[in-house]
Amino acid sequence: MPSPQNFLTPSQLAANAKRVLLVFDGGDAPGYATVAVALTEEGTRRGYEVWAATEGLRSLTSERTSSPAFERLIVGRSERYALLAEGIPVRSMGRRVLDAGSDFRSERYRGFRERARRLEAAEEFSKQGFTQLICVGGDGTFAAAKAWREQLGPQVPVGFINVSIDNDLTGDRAIGFSTGVEAGAGIARGLLEDAYTHKRIYLMEMMGNRSGRHALHCGVAARAHLVVLPNFSFPDSVLAELAAALARVDYALVVVAEGYELDRRKQLSPMPSASEFLRQQLELAGLRDGPLKRVIAEPFSRHLRGVRPAFAEVTAAYLKASLVFDAFDAGRTAIMPFVLAAHDSGLRDFADVRSHHGVEPAFMPLLERLGLPLFRRHVSEHFVSGAGGRE
């Protein structure tokens, strides 16, 4: 087998009008590997030569750190050895459909915000003979794909598949979101039962740096008493109301997103976690930790991003893969397949998709069950989308 330094690059192979590049970027979520398998199967079935960037967007720039930068993806193992013998880096994907994590990405690549890096990547894309592009990730990867089209040019068909714990793009249910809620709500519910047993107040920090949808849905599903989202901030009057309500109840679970009051916390040394910062705020407002009723800030964990996807995510991955290749075959570009329900799926143009970090009005009654009129009014006036609040 050739060493990594001696593998052929796509540019050294015969040209192919259906050489599609898959780029995986952004934060990890259940379903990255599932989407890779689905795109490999569907692309191969339709006659595409499928490749993946081994480090996401970084692989197309001079800041790449691994070799080879691109790997050919196939379904089974039957042709793998022959391709390796020819010096082609190749990976068989068929049995990875339920794998956690992803083999083809690094941490989100912020260098792509620079136009010079996107231009460099477009030149590498063309040099390697790629003819179609599918980016996979969340809202940051989507923004990168949209921006990159300027350098790639209109002749390159571009698609995007939404994979994210946060589910922060409009008009789609992200692959990974449902699995994340199922796993996260299970942990939250366990803490609620512990709170009930020992008469405690738990402030549980959950994923959500900018988007609070994961924390919101986990909190609602676990029947948390209060959900605090990343874009929330509270005046003293609301904090006093929260502290008084929590002091009155025997036990409670408060779900707080990791991005809560991030800018304020960054100014403190050492920087407290979101749950600890909220605990300190509530303590100043009158909620005291004591031997008869503990008030405990539970730390944040990213392990939910590395759990295996649910089978429902597999179905969505294959449907989205089919839809994106349908679009390419029909001559469309700048499209995102969506799957909202069994009878609600299709394609959206990039122009019709946006990031969304606010609270939908329908969820307002579900944010708390302590009876907090000041909290409800404050959130409704400042943070509910479509009601004068921030998105």
PLM region descriptions:
Residues 2-14, 65-131, 140-141, 165, ...:
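Glycine-rich oxoanion-binding loops at beta->alpha junctions
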